[in-house]
């Protein structure tokens, strides 16, 4: 629209499990494919992102996009999904004044999106300071008024890993042993033991 697009928040919750991923929030097929691509990229590069590869078989991931009654689709949330997953897996927060848009491939490339002007207007409206966009959209900035661009710090990226240096409030280190999710697995075992004890008691 003339006034701009909208900002989507993405929530990720991790729990002990068997490697399942749940996506909620009335998401369309293309957006679900973005989740699959982002997670596939993370799994194949987990050591680089500071995540123990064994983790993925021991946890379930629930990704939710609020305002569940509103249908959502399209590939432009790809790098946002990727960053949200990395943030949850590494326990490094995302800066609150950063927004991003871009399709992600299985190899971590960031592909161009449509409606750049509308997305920038939405960021301004929500008080966002920094917006990350695909490098391939750089040519589209020529058609966007300078007064819009001057209200934002616009970062152009070619690969998803570049997003992390801009968006995360901390640096990722390779395989942080403290974050190997043993505490989640341990908690899961405690719960199972408790359930077994309760069943034995009932029987």
Give the predicted meaning of each segment.
Residues 3-203:
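Peripheral, non-AAA+ core regions of ATP-driven protein-machinery
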């Amino acid at each position: 629209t003339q006034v701009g697009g909208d900002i989507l928040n993405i929530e990720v919750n991790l729990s002990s499990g068997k490697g399942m991923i749940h996506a909620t929030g009335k998401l369309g097929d293309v957006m679900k494919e973005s989740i699959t691509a982002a997670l596939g990229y993370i799994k194949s590069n987990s050591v680089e992102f500071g995540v123990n590869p064994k983790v993925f078989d021991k946890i379930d991931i629930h990704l939710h996009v609020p305002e569940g009654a509103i249908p959502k689709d399209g590939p432009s949330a790809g790098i946002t999904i990727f960053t949200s997953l990395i943030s949850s897996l590494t326990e490094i927060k995302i800066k609150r004044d950063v927004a991003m848009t871009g399709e992600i491939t299985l190899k971590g490339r960031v592909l161009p999106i449509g409606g750049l002007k509308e997305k920038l207007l939405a960021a301004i409206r929500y008080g966002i300071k920094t917006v990350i966009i695909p490098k391939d959209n750089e040519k589209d900035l020529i058609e966007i008024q300078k007064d819009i661009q001057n209200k934002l710090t616009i970062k152009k990226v070619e690969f998803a890993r570049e997003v992390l240096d801009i968006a995360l409030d901390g640096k990722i280190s390779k395989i942080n042993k403290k974050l190997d999710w043993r505490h989640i697995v341990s908690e899961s075992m405690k719960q199972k033991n408790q359930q077994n004890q309760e069943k034995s008691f009932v029987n």
